[in-house]
A protein has these predicted regions:
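Short, aromatic/basic amphipathic alpha-helical patches
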Residues: 103-113
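RNase H-like polynucleotidyl transferase catalytic core
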Residues: 37-45, 114-133, 147
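C-terminal anion-handling pockets and recognition modules
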Residues: 10-13, 131-183
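Extended, low-complexity cationic-aromatic segments
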Residues: 1-80, 177-183
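Acidic/histidine-rich, metal-coordinating catalytic segments
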Residues: 17-18, 89-102, 124, 129
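Short, well-ordered coil/turn elements that cap or connect secondary structure elements
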Residues: 8, 88, 111-115
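Mobile genetic element proteins and their domesticated derivatives, centered on retroelements
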Residues: 17, 53-54, 60, 79, ...
Length: 183
């Protein structure tokens, strides 16, 4: 990553990861006045949607898009969106080793776009991926103990939170020499 930052001072460093959002609220502990037990409605369905997200680790901006599935084709589509959002800048994309992050379609995209470089995190190390921390914050803020009666408003609230909240993960400071963080 240090090499990328030196070669492309104006380049974008993104950490990418998909996640699944279920309509069923996840329960967490909360404080409540004595005698007033919080009520969280449940839904008997397993309605869900996936989000692809990429965090700009320098500036804390997250780019998130909902999708119906996690496949290599959807990964390629999301990467094409990233290339359109940053039309002139080199992009270093940090991602995990999920099966849908590999494949001939992805290889072709990389061959056709020399501005895009991929670096894979070590296996079974989700804590290294800053996007995982974004998912955690979004779930805590929107998904846990929610009282949405319909799925569409939950999806909208989740996507709005992701795209409008600045995230300070401290990734660059932790993994890149400080002299390069100022570039």
């Amino acid at each position: 990553m240090t090499d990328f930052v030196q070669r492309h001072p104006q380049g974008i460093v993104l950490a990418m990861d998909p996640m699944s959002l279920y309509f069923q609220a996840t329960l967490t502990r909360v404080w409540a006045p004595v005698g007033q037990t919080p009520v969280v409605r449940i839904t008997p369905t397993r309605d869900h949607i996936h989000f692809y997200g990429a965090l700009d680790v320098r500036h804390g901006r997250d780019i998130a898009l909902p999708t119906d599935e996690e496949t290599t084709a959807m990964t390629v589509n999301f990467l094409m969106v990233l290339l359109m959002l940053f039309p002139t800048q080199a992009i270093l994309l940090l991602l995990d080793r999920a099966p849908w992050h590999f494949g001939p379609e992805l290889d072709q995209l990389l061959t056709e776009n020399d501005r895009l470089e991929l670096v894979y995190f070590p296996p079974a190390c989700p804590e290294l991926n800053p996007q995982e921390h974004v998912w955690e914050q979004a779930r805590e803020a929107i998904g846990h103990n929610h009282d949405f009666r319909q799925f569409a408003p939950l999806i909208d609230a989740f996507e709005t939170y992701l795209n409008e909240t600045p995230f300070d993960i401290g990734f660059m400071e932790q993994y890149v020499p400080s002299i390069l963080c100022e570039v």
